[in-house]
Amino acid sequence: MSGGAGSASGRKLTAGGTTGEPADEPLDQPIDEHCRRRPAEPLRPYVAWYTGYRQRGVPPARHRGLPSPFLTLIFTLDEPLVMLAHPDPRQPPGDFGALLGGLHSAPALITHDGAQSGIQVALRPLGARALLGLPAGELAEIDVPADAVLGGVCAELRARAVAAAGWRERFAILDEILLRLAGPKSPRMPAPDIAPEVGWTWRRLLACGGTIQIADLAAETGWSGRHLTSRFRTEIGLTPKAAARVIRFDRARHLLARQARSFSGAAGMAGGIGGTGGIGGTGSTGGTGYRLADLAVTCGYFDQAHLAREFRALAGCPPSQWITEEFRNVQAGAWLFEGA
């Protein structure tokens, strides 16, 4: 669920985090911050990054949690995470103190009333067995209370994170607890090895941005297409074709967002967001933004119409609408657009 709990769009803290939130912040001063850090070195095969977010006194908002190549683990530090809609529409809305979500091919819808804080962990699908004790495939297209999988670790982590002095300490707590889960003294049963062909296929898809033909993947593994699809879906949660689609979309929307962030600082912003000269539009942007036709070619779509259809299917809206909805994040360079 890319983008996680919110759309923190205010001050961006350093990669190392802060030693603590300022003690003298005015009570009526809006707070809107985020902080990102990579996990400890031994965790990097399993975890891509941590993001801390804190908002107070900001306008209530809704946010789209978009498909991405990562499982999502969120620990709130105050108010529950309010899910208005899950990727699977059959799953009812709900509130979560800690949420774990698998790979998905449809957007989620998250809301807050102007106050939220928490930590998002981006989990690599091939690391799910080591950290969660189950394959990523068991979480495909669903969100679950994280304690249903991780048990009492969730309560421990949340309690310690709430009491911590700041983001640096919270991320250190995450490192400690996740290393405990993945380490040799973990109470979990040893994770069975993932078939090399499955791991290779996932890494190949990531490396090519989801543009390789599935028949070529099967030929390279030496498996039949049907066998590869079955084994891959069991482990990862999506078929190779669906995974390629998500990876391709994730690349496209990040390129679009990065260009929009750059474009927002350009003088004039001719055409504006979604206009004929602006981000998401069809005309020239003078090098400061992507035309959708160019973006489609770069990311391996047949044409602009193909990209637009895929965006509607995976984001629930056209590219221009998504950029418009998230533009305050683009202006601030929020964590939503930095690998989320």
Name what the model sees in each region:
Residues 1-225, 235-242, 254-266, 271-274, ...:
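Alpha-helical bundle regulatory/interaction domains
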Residues 232, 244, 311-312, 323:
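DNA major-groove recognition helix of helix-turn-helix
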Residues 306-307, 313, 329:
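Hydrophobic side chains within alpha-helical segments
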